[in-house]
């Protein structure tokens, strides 16, 4: 079997080498034709379709294919052709022969639309980032942004939003993200004036990411609150916005709103974006712990997340038990992981929740217990643990975390009997929150449905066309009758 396979490979060595770049180049030419048509007819959906098709070809892009496509799409010797060709490695003679033969089969467009030139910047930038040539990608992305500033056409907006993203990514990968903040602000201002809503979405998220990268949460919130909001055009951008909003709300101690934003971002994110959903779940777990909730075990056992969420699973277990010593050990064990995830400061806040959880378990288990035993069970390592335990119990009683009293004379905590929870409003509140969640999900699903654009206008135009045709027929009949009368 091995010999047969080797013989087949040896019989047609050129076909296996030639077919891949030829088909990819042909696909790029079809995309160029689609962009040319979209530019001529001013149909944004054609440009959007071209971008989606390019994402599918991303892994097949090679230096020889891109070089041949640049020769096909751009005018040889032009400024754009010279600049972009300098970023692409020179192909060998064999590939050049194949590309030349295939390019002769289809003539290049007579005119060069701005959309096609911007698209060439886009695929070259994709290629450079995939090849990990980040410094060259910075130069290419900067040139593409400079070219974009001179173009004011709505058909470019879809490609421009992609260029904005990779422009920021190239600077982030080289640790120079602060350099482009003023440029992003200027671009966002221009997009707002031009009513480019997709560009506004993308640039707002990039600015929020820029601020949060340097822990500038106050500036991020000021920008977010003053930026114009509208119906989301891209699900990916909306998910990113919810994630950044959840992080800002968490730092501002608004845990309820943060939890809602983070869970919604994780739920709306595409299945393929595993890394993004993991980040959302990490922050959502911490926020739920800060709210006094214990996340379900199923969250930690999701496909592809078991290993990365393991530190947070052990942390959740320590909080659930209320063991302060175990919590400290886990905090030290995974300190590097928490620092990389930028959740270390939030985990420090959890110490108070661990103590309260342990105290709640003690109050449920014992109707009467001395403060010294409380300090031992909570493992308070301080100079005066009894006084600390008394202070902790007093604060928990004041905040309503436990239903108990302190017997100062005997130095003990006396727990009250737990009443019937169904006689309170808690079940009604929980049921109301679940119903509200289901209704919101239904409304979001309805809003997310796609309807053909301008359907009512098409009906009107068909009716008008029918009326005009009927009027023309009546006019022709009337003129024919007049001619008969003349004769």
Swiss-Prot record:
Residue ranges with Basic and acidic residues bias: 455-480
Expression sites by tissue: Preferentially expressed in flowers.
InterPro entries: 26S_Psome_reg_C (IPR013586), CSN3 (IPR050756), PCI_dom (IPR000717), WH_DNA-bd_sf (IPR036390)
Annotated ranges, domain PCI: 239-420
Record has Oxidoreductase as a keyword: no
Residue ranges with Polar residues bias: 10-21
Subunit structure: Component of the 19S regulatory particle (RP/PA700) lid subcomplex of the 26S proteasome. The 26S proteasome is composed of a core protease (CP), known as the 20S proteasome, capped at one or both ends by the 19S regulatory particle (RP/PA700). The RP/PA700 complex is composed of at least 17 different subunits in two subcomplexes, the base and the lid, which form the portions proximal and distal to the 20S proteolytic core, respectively. Interacts with UCH1 and UCH2.
Family: Belongs to the proteasome subunit S3 family.
Name by which UniProt lists this protein: 26S proteasome non-ATPase regulatory subunit 3 homolog B
Organism this protein belongs to: Arabidopsis thaliana
């Amino acid at each position: 079997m091995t010999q047969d396979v080797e013989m087949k490979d040896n019989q047609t060595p050129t076909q296996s080498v030639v077919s891949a770049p030829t088909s990819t180049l042909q696909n790029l030419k079809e995309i160029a034709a689609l962009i040319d048509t979209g530019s001529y007819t001013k149909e944004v959906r054609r440009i959007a379709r071209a971008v989606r098709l390019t994402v599918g070809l991303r892994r097949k892009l090679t230096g020889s294919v891109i070089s041949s496509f640049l020769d096909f799409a751009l005018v040889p010797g032009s400024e754009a052709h010279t600049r972009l060709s300098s970023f692409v490695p020179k192909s060998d003679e064999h590939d050049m022969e194949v590309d030349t033969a295939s390019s002769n089969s289809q003539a290049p467009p007579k005119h060069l639309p701005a959309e096609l030139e911007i698209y060439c910047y886009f695929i070259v930038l994709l290629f450079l980032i995939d090849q990990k040539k980040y410094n060259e990608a910075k130069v290419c992305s900067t040139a593409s942004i400079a070219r974009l500033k001179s173009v004011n056409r709505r058909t470019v907006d879809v490609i421009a939003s992609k260029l904005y993203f990779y422009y920021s990514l190239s600077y982030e990968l080289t640790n120079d993200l602060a350099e482009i903040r003023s440029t992003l602000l200027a671009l966002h201002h221009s997009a707002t004036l031009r009513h480019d809503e997709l560009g506004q979405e993308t640039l707002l998220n990039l600015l929020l990411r820029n601020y949060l990268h340097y822990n500038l949460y106050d500036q991020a919130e000021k920008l977010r609150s003053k930026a114009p909001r509208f119906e989301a055009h891209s699900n990916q951008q909306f998910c990113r916005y919810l994630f950044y909003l959840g992080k800002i709300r968490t730092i501002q101690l608004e845990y309820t709103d943060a939890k809602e934003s983070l869970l919604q971002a994780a739920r709306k994110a595409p299945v393929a974006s595993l890394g993004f959903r993991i980040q959302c779940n990490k922050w959502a777990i911490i926020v739920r712990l800060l709210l006094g909730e214990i996340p379900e075990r199923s969250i930690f056992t999701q496909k592809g997340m078991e290993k990365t969420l393991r530190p947070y699973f052990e942390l959740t277990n320590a909080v659930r038990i209320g063991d302060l010593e175990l919590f400290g050990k886990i905090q030290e064990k995974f300190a590097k992981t928490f620092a990389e995830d930028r959740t270390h400061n939030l985990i420090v806040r959890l110490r108070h929740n661990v103590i309260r959880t342990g105290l709640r378990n003690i109050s449920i288990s014992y109707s009467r217990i001395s403060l010294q035993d409380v300090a031992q069970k909570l493992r308070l390592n301080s100079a005066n643990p009894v006084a600390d335990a008394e202070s902790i119990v007093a604060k928990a009683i004041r905040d309503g975390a436990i239903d108990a009293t302190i017997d100062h004379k005997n130095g003990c905590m006396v727990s009250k009997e737990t009443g019937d929870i169904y006689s309170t409003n808690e079940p009604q509140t929980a049921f109301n929150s679940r119903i509200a969640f289901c209704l919101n999900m239904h409304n979001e699903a309805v809003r997310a449905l796609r309807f053909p654009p301008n359907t009512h206008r098409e009906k009107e135009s068909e009716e008008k066309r029918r009326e005009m045709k009927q009027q023309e027929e009546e006019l022709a009949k009337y003129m024919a009758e007049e001619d008969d009368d003349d004769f």
